[in-house]
Amino acid sequence: EYHFPPGYRFTLDQKYRSPWYDRECKRGLPKHLIAQELDIDFGGSGRTFFDPGELKQLEGGCRNPVLTGAVSFDEGFQEVSFIESKGGPLRLWCNLDPIGLPSREEDYAIGADIATGLAGKSASNSVLSVVSLVTGEKVAEYASHDTPPTELARQAVALCKFFRGRTTFGAFLIWEDNGPGASFRKAVMEEYEYTNVYYRRSEEHALKVKSKSPGWYSTEKTKLILLTEYGIGLRTGKFLNRSFEAVRECGFYVYVDSNKIEHVKVRGTMDPTGAGENHGDRVIADALACRALKDRPTLKLEETKAASMSNPPPGSYAQRRRERDLEKR
């Protein structure tokens, strides 16, 4: 007979539980994975990848953007500035300093999902998602359905320079390399010679050895891993998403097989950028930005963390950790 530790906090949900089971649940696993992997209940895992109830809760942390517009820049990206305009492709959830730049006390990463850029009723958006590497908060989103991959590369490099933070070179850039991603990569690295980029790792190798191939490549397995990591990031507050559209798009991902995830192409008018068919582009861009939180180049962030963690974003993992630390004192 097993005896639980004194004062153990039981979860009363009419399921067989144990300390090990409770620890696994607290890791932030999605409900469908708990049902499938822990309860061995494949019917309970359902067909939607992201839990609808959790997405509804996440919408409570979404905000209207602080600013909307676009970046203006010269040919060499030496002068990059923000130009405010209603209906612009770039939305900011961060304040700019007196000279019109984002905080220089943080570092940033940008996730990119690249579409063909063929404008039309069923066109998919190309999306750039900007995240603070210190707080995990999404601070900006660029979305356009009529920007070709090579032009998106130019916009991405400009945005990297705009969100260069404490670096002299710019934000860490990660993109999906499939399809039009190849043209994007060539423009970023060869034409604009931007090299602060993600190099994919072998998902099969235990040590996840870094390869010499830039960009993230999507397969059934790598997509499942990426979106699972992203779901955990959302659930634990390590990735704080402020975009209503981005959170709602998560609800369109479903299982079409035991381990295959696809986006259900839903026609609608909820997308303010004009793309009548949403292909989950924001979700992939956000998931890649989330990947960058743990896979960017090692930087000395101690001083920056100390400054930023003194007032972390509400609802973030950092805020909850700070509250736990205060309770222990």
Tell what function each PLM region has.
Residues 103-133:
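Gly/Thr-rich phosphate-binding beta-strand-loop-beta motif of the actin/hexokinase/Hsp70
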Residues 106-107, 123-124, 145-156, 223, ...:
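Phosphate/oxyanion-binding active-site loops and adjacent basic polyanion-contact surfaces
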Residues 113, 176, 281-284:
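Acidic active-site catalytic centers that drive phospho-/nucleotidyl reactions
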Residues 1-110, 236, 240:
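Non-catalytic, compositionally simple segments
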Residues 280-282, 287-329:
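Acidic two-metal-ion nuclease catalytic site recognized across multiple nuclease folds
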